[in-house]
Amino acid sequence: SNKYRMRQGTLLAVSMLLFCIFLLSGCGKLPEGMLKQEKELYTQGQIRMIAATERNRYQNLYTGQLWSVTADGQGNTFESLLKSQIGQFLEELAVVDRMADEQGIQLTSQDEDDINNLAEEYLAYMQVSKDEVLDLYRKYYRADKTVSQMTESKNLEVSDAEAKVIQVERIETDSREKAEELLLQASEEKSDFTSIEEKNSLNSQIKFQLEWGPDLKEPDRSAFALEADEISDIIEKDGRFYIQKCVNAYDQQATALRKERLAQKKKTEAFQKIYLPYQEKYRVRLDGDVWENIDFSAGEGCNSDNFFSLYHSYFSK
């Protein structure tokens, strides 16, 4: 089926990957077309859904004591910073939802059926109305769909060469004479390169996973010229001498993951060029009162952290 999706991750990662926009700033006169602050933008139940998901995701990993901890140099607590991130996400979601209206991007009957099933499952975890869950998932899905449709004409392809990941083993020494001696040993028939490097390398790390990039420095750059099981010549860099052996000239799994990551980055950058001018015209602010009943230090009986993970289980590749 023709399904759209965002990359799985934290709320901040979702916000950055989908929108790549920092918290909207500035006060004073509202620009023409700007959405006014209003409590009705989201219900308290919808805000609790996102807040509970993020609160519990962190608390399930760490501890409930973290909310009062000072998290930056300005004296903000971890709770206040996370609320700011949640607010940013909800504001951006509202902007892209309005963009979808103007672009005529709507949900199909199949989309509605999928989202209805998703909402029914989520209701088992949260004490909110079905309408609140449906509305929030619709906004989230349509924002996802808007990003996909508005970037589908862009060149987002990433080549295997661009995403290439390799595995190497490396000997590092501070003497050319020593390096020449070790290269002779490593070049002998049936020599054990791993054993030689473990005994002689000055760096305790001997295995490296390298990602190709145009700005690679030595000795990383030379490693990409090696074939599988090939041993390099001596490479000198900043008074150190390196000998490398290519263990895997094309790490298929790691390359595929990186290719997906780079494609998502291109997609984010392409959408950002569309989103930023639009966001300047239609800004959104949540009313400050929406946080009055949201207390991260309370709610120990609720451990739901799956608003986003459940979404991705429905709308994945």
Give names to the regions the model predicted.
Residues 28-132:
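N-terminal targeting/tethering segments
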Residues 52-56, 87-106, 117-128, 138-156, ...:
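Sec-exported extracytoplasmic/periplasmic mature domains
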Residues 2-13:
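Bacterial N-terminal signal peptides that target proteins for export
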